[in-house]
Amino acid sequence: MYYWRLCEVFYQFRTNNNLSPAELCAFLYDFAPNFISKENTEIPKPSQAWCIGGLIDPAEVYDITFWQANPETKKGDILIHYETSPISAITCIWIAQADGVIDPFFHYYSNTYIGDKIDIPRITLKELQTDKYFSKHPLVRKKFQGVNGWPMSSEDYSELLRMIKAKGFDTDTLPKLYTPTLPKNVSIEIERDVEQQLLEPLLNSMEWYENKDFIRQLPIHAGRGHRVFPDYALHYDNKPDYERAKVLIEAKLHMKNNREVEEAFLQARSYALLLDSSVIVLCDKQCLIIYEKKDSFDRDRYKKYHWVDFENPDIFNELKNKLNYK
């Protein structure tokens, strides 16, 4: 229904301006993108690396180029470009200039804008096939078929940097996957220390900030004349009597055993039901426990992370995606 309405709008615009179908396409895909000013925003640090592919025609490459990509691509992500036959090699690295989108007017399923191209020494398919690490990689084994939008782990990217460095290239000039620098040697003595020294720095590293993306002690009605105050509400709406939060977070000093975890879970679940939350997070000085709602919250279905785990870009990105309910 919406697609048909969109077609009607474009048709009306074309006829009102006496444009042919070809001229309308030229306007949409060439004139408008090149002449309508774009918002100049800072490129975020990369949280994920992806592979893209295809031959690069120098005549069609601009500072920012339209390219097929994974719809989950985020602005700032690293894009490793494999040029297909006859080159058959990784030749450059780009940075995503926009989030990936699904475009019904594009020949391929999804795309993004790419820029900040960095040429690197060619890493050929043959070299990858004989490399101890990449010879077992599924994308290499199928000779980069379906390359566009293939996710690369932090280990994949590190191993690729190893091969590039071996060719004498200064890999310090290449983008690095982002991991937060969480406080070291923290002194955790009370529950508030867990919140201020561990939880809030982690949320800030994901670019979520207090009173913008999350709120502490959100007052919610829990019966006639009674209010409760969950520790943190992430992606929240604090409209009185209609309070909502996509993610509910409860912090404790130390959940020493299953009984204490059970008590914290039951408390958090009661708040989550009032706020129509999709995710519950329990955290203490040692770890975070994530419960995702599948029809209901299940005490026995969870994912556990230790704070040190977030030094791994893949794990950091995995948690961010779990909490990124909008």
Residue ranges and their predicted role:
Residues W67-E72:
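Short, surface-exposed secondary-structure edge patches
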Residues K75, T84, P175-V279, C287-K326:
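A short, conserved, highly charged catalytic patch centered on acidic carboxylates
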Residues E83-A89:
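Short, charged beta-turn/beta-strand-edge "cap" motif at the junction between a beta-strand
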Residues A89-V101:
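Short beta-strand-centered aromatic/proline hotspots
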